[in-house]
Amino acid sequence: SNNIAQTAYKPEGKSPSQLVDEAEQKIFEIAERGSRNSTYLELRQMIQPTYDRLYQRSQKGGGLSGVSTGFRELDRLTAGLQKGELIIIAGRPSMGKTAFALNIAEHIALSDKNNPVAIFSMEMSAEQLTFRMISSLGMVHGSALKTGKLTDKDWDRVDGAIQQMKEAPIFIDDTPSLTPVELRARARRIQRERGLSLIVIDYLQLMQVPGSKENRATEISEITRNLKALARELQIPIIALAQLNRSVEQRTDKTPIMSDLRESGSIEQDADLIGFIYRDEIYHKDTDKKGQALIAIAKQRNGPIGDF
């Protein structure tokens, strides 16, 4: 506490937001040190709860052990989104990353009102996301919503979507350039007040590390490490969308590979699951796969890889 007070009296050219961020970070570190005392467990202590978890899974008939995404093939590969896991969904612009993540968020929140979802959107405003959800749930073309040229049938669908959305426990924070400390504080508050079953971050590279003099790769490493720690702390899955670098554009085969991730080293290391999204029609207008997206699971720490 003395250090925090001294920093406030002697800011050394730092902005108020940087001072608050550093104070929150120091408070978090103090809390972490306290929570880390005597945290070891004997293996024998873990046997019964682990056996109980296995028995619960067997009672489901080999079904999902995590939260259903609403995508049958993704659930088959992952057994659902698992608690404490950091999931990266990556792709080039216009591939449908946000739409894919929103579909998962909508499915989880609408399937059970006790499954609140938090969306931290640093790319789009809350209004833009709301329009996206109306389009998705109401099956109304985005261009019709943008121009306002709606048929009577469109209006019926919009009304139906809005009725569903009123019941959905989805919370949107559209603050740009969040820091890991800010995001963690906001996520904890929602968890404490409403509970959380999933966090979606759109997108990873738009997060910032204030006052950092490190290169961007090192900053991304700090961000992914913090997100993984938050997933474990809150015991929920976190989906972080990520942008792929331009090297994809120089290749004949545009299908994403792991090295296409910007500042990919730490992302690959910290993520429990990495999925790439690819739409062939973006590069080949005459493709027979119009309106289709390929989802490729390139890494899964505790399961198989594959695509659908």
What are these regions (language model features)?
Residues 100:
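Hydrophobic positions on the alpha1 helix immediately C-terminal to the Walker A/P-loop
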Residues 1-60, 84, 90, 95, ...:
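Short, small/acidic-rich helices and loops at N termini and domain boundaries
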Residues 76, 107-195, 209, 308:
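Cytosolic-facing regulatory segments adjacent to core modules
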Residues 71-80:
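Pre-Walker A adenine-sensing motif
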Residues 218-308:
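Phosphate-binding/switch region of NTP-binding enzymes
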Residues 9-21, 33-47, 64-71, 148, ...:
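Conserved phosphate/pyrophosphate-binding and hydrolysis machinery centered on Walker-type P-loop NTPases
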